[in-house]
Amino acid sequence: IFMSKIKKINSAKIILPSIVLFFTVVLLLSLPVLLNYNSIQNIIEKKVSSEFKINLKILDDISLKIFPRPHYLVKKANIDLNIENDNSSIIETNNLRIFIPYTKIYSKSNITIKEIELENANIYFKIDDVLDFRNHLYYKINKPIHIKNSKFFFLDKNNKTIFISPIKKINYSINKKSNSKELKIKGNIFDIKYD
């Protein structure tokens, strides 16, 4: 009888703090979601420009999502590879994720960006942009950019579409073993699949 009372007391001592700890963690992770992140639009744009060497123009609301990994979700944005040339290629996206560490979910001024992910983007690329893209490959950037389920539009000098290529996935990152940049593309051109 005495042993069964001890087991009941011990299990209550474990279960109750576990429940309190669980709800405390959920509450702490949920609080930043309620804040307004449109005020840090300029900070995010400058940080992306300095760390990824791309021009980001946020066109719609910014929100913070905690799961599955903490990230800022930008509903609509334009991205440009050449910071100095306004006529360079543009990527239009309706779903831009900017991933941040868990330790920075409360920070609005000291933002750390781990990687960027674009989904359902339209990539407009001209023959003149090949040089901009090649130059971008030489920048010392070690944070990955991922593009998923997007369309690549190749344009002529008059901005008329020559062809459209669906892209399943693009991974643009540094291979840490060989210390070189990698560009992995999965999609198809003229019904020919490429990896």
Protein language model features and the residues they cover:
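N-terminal type II signal-anchor transmembrane helix
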Residues: F2-K53
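Flexible beta-edge/linker motif
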Residues: A12, S18, V33-I40, K47, ...
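A short, amphipathic edge element
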Residues: I54-D60
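Short, intrinsically disordered, charge-balanced linker/junction segments flanking boundaries
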Residues: D191-D195
